[in-house]
């Protein structure tokens, strides 16, 4: 689909267009394909407009807030809605978008719902009624306004008179940390509650899952996705890393199966840059990349890929030299990755920092160092953090740990409890 849109975009751009308007769209995935295609051809402004049903969602189930979150992260210059309903029904969707929009919003309603009279399609909303509701749309947050089906020059003239002197709504200047699937979104807040990333969809150590994947079956993947959603996961990690399969194709197949089974946003997890890129290209939402370190391949190639596809990423404080020797080195890596991200237009709102958990049995100070990282990220860097609890859990099962070590860790947890995301094995 991207290639089809690229062919059109290339011709339109060469013909001298000033901007692109992708409108009356019913699928968020098609919107993504169009924006990606245009951005791969030129840098002209892009406006994207979807059409919504009476239930406030597109035909494929996307709500207004999710649409603006995904499309503005992908690089759209304005997002909104057109057609489908009369102007009154557009007020609430515009308000929903305005809560998250960092780009201008547009609204182009019909002149009411169409009626068939004596074989002729008729729109009942008068220019005066249309203009009156148009002012409410501007108050709701629309910065660009117009008309769609059934509107006439008289409707647009009345609209201009009604809204011409109204102040233009300015989008939010502070971004929010948002992830999204095609049908829902979640926010990662520094002052918010714990969030859970379900990480069971990973063949490592799971012989039954490995055998099934080698047979080309994703039945267990679907079951694991459903079980984790039912048990409270808010984000699902997808990892297909194992020998004996086409990992890239299996990742793409798994994403399709999981997004068809549950609504949760996904975390794309692979050690291969090309696999993450392929996954981000087809994922119908805003994903979390697991992960980007200061290693050359990750920082030079994967970071721009995350930017291109509008993804957030987990910052892993590692470098080509391996594990940091101490907290100071770890802090330096975090600062440098943030600097590199900001240099290409990303920011703190696009990042979650991995605490880099080591096993307590091997290093009794591991938990304290981990919590020190959490404290540094939250209090000095204003960055949320992520912690792999399976490391602690397996350590408790297999390695002896003294009461003193456990008490020290427990006390530290009580003092520094504000992790923001807690990956967990269900």
Please name every model-derived segment.
Residues 1-354, 358-426:
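Domain-level signal for soluble alpha/beta catalytic cores
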